Amino acid sequence: MADLWYAAYGSNLARDRFTTYLSGGRPVGAARHYPGARDPRPPSDDRPLLLPGRIYFAGRSLTWGGGMAFYDPDAPGTVYARAYRLSAEQFSDLAAQEMRRDPGTDLDLAPVLAGRRHSYGPGRYETLHLVGELEQHPVLTFTAPVDHGLAPNPPGPGYLATIARGLRECHRLSDDTVVAYLDAARAVSGS
């Protein structure tokens, strides 16, 4: 497979934050430095995307402090996402960094492409979902497994601000719409 689309729904909605997974570096407000991808070029395309489901915040981010955004594709609602067109290699390196692994190994995407959902491990962001298709290429995202056991937790201010910036940047949402959307996600999270 040459290309695919990655659907971002958390801080990766903000393009400059997302591209640190490719080029390497430390996003503004984050505590973690990312090694980057084998192919550091920016995405060949990106666009707004709507997904069925909802986001919620849980666990504790070592990068941002506070809860992390997770995607529940089975919940009612609509998720504002951003689709980035990447090579399969770039996606593998992105996923590795999200899974707190070293980049450099290609993921076997056949299981998720065949079954629409596949867990590559027990941790957060190790469950991949095939959420659709764009221009005859698969759209993939990752989240925690359904039974992850992470406690609901409000997001840290830097993380929340990065998500809000990405929502405005990609979807051109008003501040009021961004606040209402993130408040709804925090309410689901019990925060």
Can you say where each PLM-predicted feature lies in the sequence?
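Glycine-aromatic micro-motifs
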Residues: 1-191
